[in-house]
Every structure is written in C-alpha cells, then in structure tokens.
C-alpha cells in the first residue's frame, strides 16, 4: 500500500495526484530548497510508489515553474534571480489590485468569516512554526478575498505566479519576526475590507507584498 497520504476529496485521488501533493508539501515546507536536485527514483522510494506517477507529478511542477528540467541531469527546484522575483511581484501587484477592487463590493459575511478564519489559522500556524500549514492558510486568506471578483482567468494567472515563488515564500516564512509581521499585515487588510475602503485595501496589499519582496531580495542579494 502506498505511504502517500490520501486526499480528503469526494473522488479518490490518483497516485500521481497524491505524489504531486506530497511534493508540493516538500516545496512549501522547505524540505526541497531552490537549486536542489529532485530524482524520480528517490521520490518513488520515499513514497512507496512506482516511477510513472512521480514522472507525471514532476512534469506538472515543471509546467508551473516550480521545477526546471535539465537534459541528462534531471529535475531541480527552480532558482530565481532577483530580477525574476521583481517581475513576478510586479505582475502580482497589477493583477491583484484589479481583483481586489472588483472583489470588495462582492464580499459577503460568509466569505469574510472564512477569510478571517484563514487569517487566524495562519497566525496560529506561525506561532507554532508550522510553515507548511501557515503557507496553506495564507493562500486561503489571499485567494479567498480575490476569488470574490469572479475573474477565473486572472485568478489562474495569479495562482501560477504564486506557485512559481512558493519555495522562496517558505524561506520568507521561516523567520519568526516575518511571521509575526505577516499576521499584523493580515489584520490591517481585514480592517480595510471591513471598512469597505478600496484604496486602503490596495495600499495594505501592496505594503504586505513589498515587504515579502524586500526580505527575499536581501536573501538573494546579501550585503
């Protein structure tokens, strides 16, 4: 029997989907670091599965930009230059501002409750230093807000941009001080949402994003 955890979904996950979820967890938890080689054989042995579903999962992560394939060498966790991060974060700024403005009038009480819950889960995970859980809650928080805009094509692009920097986000959240700072930023974002203040919301999202980029810039280009 496979040692991969089974997803709690209405339809049974395929082995490839289970492998993909496991690899995503390794990326966001920092078990797989930028530049690290990922071999099909090692992954297959560690999860107790055959190579075929591992190969399929690795291809998905390559398409998302989280892995790169080098001929005759295999797969590696993507390494980004600071210029790459700056481009990605600028694209996020433009797309997320658009969705934030569209989403704000559509946010109902039920959605706001879910978003607040995600922020609380993010903070609690940060306090216990569970980076993988914190990153998952962080996504639910941000995407829960933006998805209210009902712009699926823009949302798909935003998800791809987030995916491409996930290993670096894990590095950012490894800092206790930055985890606390992020929790405070989420509270300010929620306050702007509660006030239905679009300009304030955009400003808080920009500040939150800019802080993450500044930390990553320092990591990639130390003084």
Language-model-detected regions and their locations in the chain:
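Hydrophobic packing residues in well-ordered alpha-helices of helical domains and bundles
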Residues: 88, 115, 134, 138, ...
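Short loop-to-helix capping motifs
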Residues: 129-130, 151-152, 196-197
